[in-house]
Design a protein with these regions (language model features):
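Histidine-centered active-site loop/cap adjacent to the catalytic His
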Residues: 4-6, 191-236
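Surface-exposed patches in mature extracellular/periplasmic domains of secreted proteins
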Residues: 31-43, 134-138, 179-181, 220-226
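Solvent-exposed loop/turn segments at secondary-structure junctions
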Residues: 9-13, 42-48, 103-108, 141-146, ...
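Active-site segments of SGNH/GDSL-like serine hydrolases
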Residues: 98-107, 123-158, 183-186
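Substrate-gating cap/lid alpha-helix
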Residues: 142-181, 200-204
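Sec-exported extracytoplasmic/periplasmic mature domains
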Residues: 11, 15, 25, 29-33, ...
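Conserved SGNH/GDSL esterase-like catalytic core that processes O-acyl groups on lipids
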Residues: 4, 10-117
């Protein structure tokens, strides 16, 4: 089974990150009976100094080059991925898409309705390359901007409602769609390093959202076992 991660800056990661893609590879690798490959046209991280996706400096240098493959980009959203997803699926011969998109769209490019329309266009285009393609879609996780920007927070909530409707409308037995649950107890104060981009605990929680959705719906792999233990309360 060939998995293609698709996303924005939360998925590509930056220099020195592990990324949730790394956590997903670790998860897949715990199941000897799961024949899998991670595919995609890109392998790099984003270098904020160079302002370009040119870094190979993952936090764990032993992350296998073949497992680093993805289709994600800093500042890229549904708007950018919808026109290129068919070629990416076709060239990679992908079977499953793991998609985390929408925050960038809502923050900079499109409103909730336009973003949902682009998500639908993405799904339709991807299926032209593989009519039996499976997709797991992660809802938007509002970032720190939503704390003080009520219209933006409302736009994120509205888009998530529209994404759920798109999944219900477009789901097909031959090409199933899964809407993953928002990661359990995800807290931008502790699970990100800047209010948006996941740190180690956030990476685990994003990977768990995808892994648990696939296990529960498709009996693929198993429950995610890599979540860090919750911090113990300080003594009184």
């Amino acid at each position: 089974m060939r998995f293609l991660p698709v996303g924005d800056s939360m998925t590509i990661g930056a220099t020195g990150d592990f990324t949730w893609r790394y956590r997903m590879w670790q998860h897949f690798d715990t199941f000897p009976g799961l024949r899998y490959e991670i595919v995609g046209p890109r392998t790099t991280l984003y270098d904020t100094g160079a302002n370009a996706p040119v870094s190979h400096a993952y936090a764990d240098p032993s992350f296998p080059p073949a497992a680093r493959r993805h289709l994600s980009g800093w500042g890229e959203g549904w708007l950018h991925m919808a026109p290129v997803i068919a070629d990416a699926v076709r060239e990679a011969e992908a079977d499953v898409l793991l998609v985390s998109l929408g925050l960038i769209d809502l923050g900079f490019y499109t409103d909730a309705e336009q973003t949902a329309a682009n998500a639908r266009a993405f799904i339709t285009a991807a299926r032209t390359a593989n009519p039996r393609l499976r997709m797991v879609l992660l809802p938007v996780i509002p970032n720190v901007r939503a704390v003080t920007d009520a219209p933006f927070a409302a736009s994120c909530a509205r888009f998530n409602d529209l994404l759920a409707k798109a999944v219900a409308d477009l789901d097909e037995p031959s090409s199933p769609l899964l809407l993953a649950s928002r990661p359990t107890a995800y807290d931008i104060r502790t699970d990100t390093y800047d209010g948006t981009h996941p740190g180690p605990t956030g990476e685990h929680k994003l990977a768990a959202a995808f892994a648990d959705a696939m296990h529960q719906a498709w009996e693929l792999g198993g429950p995610y076992a890599g979540l860090p233990a919750p911090a113990l309360p300080l003594p009184a």
